[in-house]
């Protein structure tokens, strides 16, 4: 036993010695992050919002601004109301603060009921009832209980007062002009839609889409663009339950609480004005900054041309140029060519700084080569725009003369 134990000790010592003399294991190399430089913020079609401000600083009128960004269009008129889905209200019904003269309209019959007053009643609610019906209930602040007031076979809406306070799931109150309608979109719960005049709607849009401190001509241009955008989508949503959402997927809308004196003035100064092409409302797209050139679209009034106003001095544009980094793993996942060896822009528009907006991007990796559109890269890497370059890559080619095959 003793000899075996000694032998085991000797063998163990030899292994330790051999291990100590072996070369240390080299840490696996980590692929570096990818640096991406760019210009602008958004798709670049239609009006640059910072460009409109730059043009206003340069002394251009609202008409000159709109003529530049929507060439070939004419001024028209529009009135009426708009239906906006309120995304922040994720409850099963529509809950509002109780105020005098608040009413409920039965949308099936058109009849309006004035809600009763009560000293301790401080909330009203429209909730689902039966098959596609609604019920209206009140909340008593003293007893802390809900009491059923009336049932309806169809949808209903609160109306009758200048401003109604919508109670959100967080308990916060957001005020809206017009009516607050309950609609059944999914069959599972009721969504909230604000039915409001077009002009009052714009009062809640313009200060959310532009800075209220901007020059009057820039704010007026934003008002006309937003009004036109609304009317265009309204004309295509007649059979739907709402016309627009209230987020960046449509136009940002904050209701009454977002209104500012300067933007209300801009809306009033352009009351009813929209832009037409061949007698019809245009797709009045706009984005924060086009980087120095407008982007071409699928309609005649969305053209590719240089824009000297986007980076105009004192416009305050923070996205004239920008630089970001993305982890190597994230970039590799986008292109799916293994370890990235090179990234380069293959084609550009040829208009604007650095050869213009990128059109296609090539990645060469350990598993091959892949070409994506610049918009695909923008979306998948969460970039501010598709006007991009890869400054650390010696293979980046800004020339508009290089095609998708690299020739």
Tell what function each PLM region has:
Residues 2-407:
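Conserved, single-site charged/polar hotspot
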């Amino acid at each position: 036993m003793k000899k075996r134990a000694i032998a085991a000790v000797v063998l163990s010592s030899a292994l330790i010695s051999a291990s100590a003399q072996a070369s240390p294991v080299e840490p696996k190399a980590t692929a570096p992050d990818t640096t991406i430089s760019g210009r602008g913020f958004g798709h670049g079609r239609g009006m640059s919002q910072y460009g409109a401000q730059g043009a206003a600083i340069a002394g251009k009128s609202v008409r000159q601004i709109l003529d530049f960004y929507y060439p070939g269009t004419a001024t028209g008129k529009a009135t009426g109301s708009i239906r906006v889905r309120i995304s922040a209200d994720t409850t099963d019904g529509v809950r509002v603060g109780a105020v005098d003269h608040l009413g409920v309209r039965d949308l099936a019959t058109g009849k309006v009921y004035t809600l009763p007053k009560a000293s301790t009643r401080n909330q009203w609610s429209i909730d689902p009832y039966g098959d596609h019906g609604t019920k209206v209930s009140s909340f008593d602040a003293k007893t802390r209980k809900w009491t059923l007031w009336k049932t309806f076979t169809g949808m209903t809406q609160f109306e009758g007062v200048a401003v109604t306070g919508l109670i959100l799931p967080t308990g916060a109150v957001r005020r809206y002009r017009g009516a607050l309608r309950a609609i059944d979109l999914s069959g599972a719960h009721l969504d909230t839609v604000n039915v409001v005049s077009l002009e009052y709607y714009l009062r809640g849009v313009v200060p959310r889409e532009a800075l209220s401190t901007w020059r009057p001509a820039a704010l007026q241009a934003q008002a006309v663009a937003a009004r036109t955008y609304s009317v265009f989508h309204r004309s295509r949503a007649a059979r739907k339950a709402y016309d627009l959402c209230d987020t960046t997927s449509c136009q940002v809308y904050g209701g009454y609480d977002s209104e500012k004196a300067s933007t209300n003035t801009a809306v009033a100064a352009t009351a009813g004005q929209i832009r037409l092409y061949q007698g019809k409302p245009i797709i009045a797209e706009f984005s924060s900054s086009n980087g120095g050139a407008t982007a071409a679209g699928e309609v005649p009034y969305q053209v590719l041309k240089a824009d000297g106003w986007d980076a105009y001095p004192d416009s305050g544009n923070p996205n004239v140029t920008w630089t970001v980094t993305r982890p190597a793993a994230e970039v590799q996942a986008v292109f799916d060519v293994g370890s990235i060896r090179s990234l380069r822009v293959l084609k550009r528009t040829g208009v604007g700084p650095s050869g213009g907006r990128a059109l296609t991007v090539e990645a060469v990796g350990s598993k091959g080569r892949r070409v994506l559109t610049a918009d695909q890269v923008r979306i998948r890497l969460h970039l501010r725009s598709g006007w991009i370059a890869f400054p650390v890559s010696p293979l980046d080619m800004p020339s508009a003369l290089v095609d998708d095959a690299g020739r």
